[in-house]
Amino acid sequence: MKDAGELAEPPGPLPPALAAALAAFERYLRLERSLSPHTVRAYAGDISSMLEHASRQGVAAPEGLGLPELRGWLAIQHESGAARATLARRGAAARSFTAFAYRRGWLATDPGSRLGTLKTRRALPHVLRQNEMAAVLTGLDKAGRQAEAAIAAEAAGQPADAASQRADAASQRTEAAVALRDAAVLELFYATGIRVSELCGLDPGHFDHGRRTVRVRGKGDKERTVPVGVPALRAVNRWLTAGRPALATAASGPALFLGVRGRRLDPRTARRIVHELLREAGVTRDAGPHGIRHTAATHLLEGGADLRSVQEMLGHSSLATTQIYTHVSVERLKASYRQAHPRA
């Protein structure tokens, strides 16, 4: 299937007025709306594609942009095989841009306000069962204790004389440190339900160990305080005490989690860590960090947490976003009923 952004004609340089409008819109998203770099890149890429299409239709400045250009661009995206969710996002990007241009006085009317909203089908998230999650974390805790003991034993021993022995010791120390880090990463994801970008942005100073909470900076640069369970705090402390010093370099800064080169852990690596840990534990469901977030929320609701508390913990701006987890819990209840009730 052709990529949704692939058009029949190669894109050319935008006319100066359109290029300036795109740059202003990108600054607005980044500085005024405080959107994440990922969202800014996605919206800017969408609008760049839309303006390239408009330029080919003879539009040289924002004031020439109208509803036909918007609809024509979205029609091309649909014909190119864009997924329903992608089309919905690109429509939202177009509406955001024209509203921005209208407020700036570049447009006499806002054509995006007349653009229909494409409703996406929200799929129920994949979640792990509580016994599956417990088995994974129990195994990681055991591996973490073994790694901690290995680092302590290596530190207490005599320095190796031969270069090869020193290299082997360093390699084993790094391997043990990575095991401690990975255990803390998964424990913290499950304990808090935070997003992968939020976890990667954490510093040790964000934790209040006495109150068992962590300060998280989420979407829109909004800060919230999230509870952390004892096992997760124990895993984090184990990593900070025994693991992090083995990976830290001058470039590490205050980052909580580090990659093997000593720099702040990036979201891509964090996703890989979670996928690998679950696969090694024999979990067949495809659940990365976002799946663990879904799992944490579902388990909270199954345990009796109220929806508003879960909304606050996850950092959802709308309660409707959190309500999907109630559907997950109901579906699981229905499945259990069908399996267990004699007259189901």
Regions found by a protein language model. Name each.
Residues M1-A344:
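Conserved catalytic core of the tyrosine transesterase superfamily
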